[in-house]
Structures are given as structure tokens and as C-alpha cells.
Amino acid sequence: MTMLTAVAAARAEVCRLHAALVTAGLVAWTSGNVSARVKGDGDGDPDLMVIKPSGISYDDLTPESMVVCDLDGNRVDGEYQPSSDTASHAYVYRHMPQVGGVVHTHSTYATAWAARGEAIPCVITAMADEFGGEIPVGPFALIGGDEIGRGVVATLTGHRSPAVLMRSHGVFTIGGTANDAVKAAVMCEDAARTVHLARAYGNPPPLPPDQVDALHHRYTTEYGQR
């Protein structure tokens, strides 16, 4: 696949995944974003990223409107300015080479946990499966530069969770692909809602670490079609 073909495919995929955020109820108005890494072709072309344009309605997004940037956050191709979170996405890609996709949302329940500055405890098996433990809280950081990206990397490095609650802001998720990162965002909101409701009726106990390990191992090595 040529770099040109790979970029076109990434634009189509990133556009489709933004629609998935809307379908899942994770975003409102123009907030939130998905990006995908485009691997260099091995002939000297560096990795690129494709990301949502800033301030454009989800109804108006097309593959052609997705913005191509280098991993310093500079626009390489596209009619529009990229998302205000571009520098942070780029920082994640530079410092976490295993990451192929990044997602940011202000989904309601997960952002409520972020506003409290509280990690979501691992009290249900679905969390052990997907996150391998609690969903951690990252530091407060201002929007616009790469400070959020720095917080994401610092929090998730060495952590099994693909999701982080950035304090008083919202959710960032990572994945081997952009689709994986969107899945993590969907599952993060589902876990945040479930644990919030459980807390309304009492104080659910965390799962024992050995059970979390066993559940996460089974999910990541045996679940699904392989």
C-alpha cells in the first residue's frame, strides 16, 4: 500500500469512527475527536496522523475534511485547521510507538469521575477484561499545547488501562488501532455509568488482584475469533 493510499484509508476510517462516537452517545456538538496513526512506508516517509478538523459539526464531516498532520502536530494536508487537541495526540504517538489510535471525549459519566478526580475502581468483570484494573486519573492540563498528551503518556505508561480520566476535563483512550481506541472509550463510559449506579446503593468491593489478572489474561488471549 502506498502512503497516499494509506492516508486515504485512514481518512475514511477516522471519519467513520467519529460517526461511531455519535452513535454511542459519547460526544455533544463538536466536542471530542479521533485520530489514527499512518505508518511511514519504509522508504523514508515518516509516520503521519489523521485527525478531526476543529469546530466542524459531526454532520458535516467527510473523509476529505479529515486533516493530515505530522507527528509534531503540523498540518500536512487538509482544508481545515486540525483539532485543538492535535499537539497532545501527536505527543502520544511520538512517545508511545505501539499506539495506532487516540480518542478524546467528554462522555457524561466518565467525565463526572474526572471532575471528582477519582479513579474508577475495578469492581466488575468487564473492567478487569478491558482495562486490567482501575481506570486511572491523570493530571489537570490546559488545552492547546501538548500538556494533556504529556499527562496521558505519564499516566498510561506501564498501566494496563487504555483509558485515562484527565482531571476536570474528560477521557482519553489509546489503542493499537483507532477502532480499538474507540472501543476503549465506549467501554470506559459503560464502566463509569455502571460503577456510579452501583455506588448509589452501597460501596462495591474491588475485585481481588489475582482475579483481575486472570480475567484480563483470558480476555486478551482467548476471547473472540483468533
Regions found by a protein language model. Give the residues of each.
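Glycine-rich flexible loops
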Residues: 1-226
